[in-house]
Amino acid sequence: EAAAPLIGEAQLVVGSTTSGCRRSGKGELIVSGEGRTQLGTLDASPAPTWLSPWRQGVPDFEWETDIRSVLLAKVALNAVINPLTALRGVTNGELMQPPLRAITEEVIEEVQSLLRTADAREIASALPEQVRAVCDSTAANHSSMRVDLEGGKRTEIDAIVGWLLSNLTPQPPSTPVLSELYGAVKERDLRVSRA
């Protein structure tokens, strides 16, 4: 949404992917998961003509006419996993194990509450299983927020949790655990900014 005014008449294509990679200690990129890529436009336009040749380079790909829902589901998922793994210094899979399972479930419930208030009930209903599936399938992975925090870099906390708390709905419900996680990561980000 922020980029749209900057591009004039050009068509803005946005997307989400479940593919992932990380840098090795030597700076090489290592594929940590091959997944699905979804693209679309915010105005629900049909697929552009350039898509056919582009599709050949991306194995599991889909054009989505409702990309907003795809992006919201991804933000909701990341709002649960990323701050917890970053602040606790754990892998994705550890979130579904004691002692972190209880707080993970609390955060899921708070994000679901935000989604329901914004009338995104289907995304809210799917969130618990989506979190479990991602934590299982990427059990050994480190979230990007954890990598950024441990590397002394600024995180995407504002674009993920900050956006959910501030922009999803005009009157958000109480989210004490999620808000506390947001504040803790923000504080670390501020320290990075000052350094």
Each model region followed by its residue ranges:
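Rossmann-like NAD(P)(H) cofactor-binding subdomain of soluble oxidoreductases
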Residues: 1-28
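Short glycine/proline-enriched coil/turn segments at helix->beta-strand junctions
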Residues: 7-10, 57-59, 169-170
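Residues at the C-termini of beta-strands that transition into short coil/loop
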Residues: 16-18, 33, 43, 65
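Helix-loop-beta segment of a Rossmann-like dinucleotide-binding subdomain
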Residues: 28-38, 86-96, 141-151
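FAD/FMN-dependent oxidoreductases across multiple families
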Residues: 47-83, 130
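Active-site-proximal catalytic alpha-helix in oxidoreductases
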Residues: 68-112
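NAD(P)-dependent Rossmann-like dehydrogenase/reductase catalytic/cofactor-binding core
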Residues: 105-195
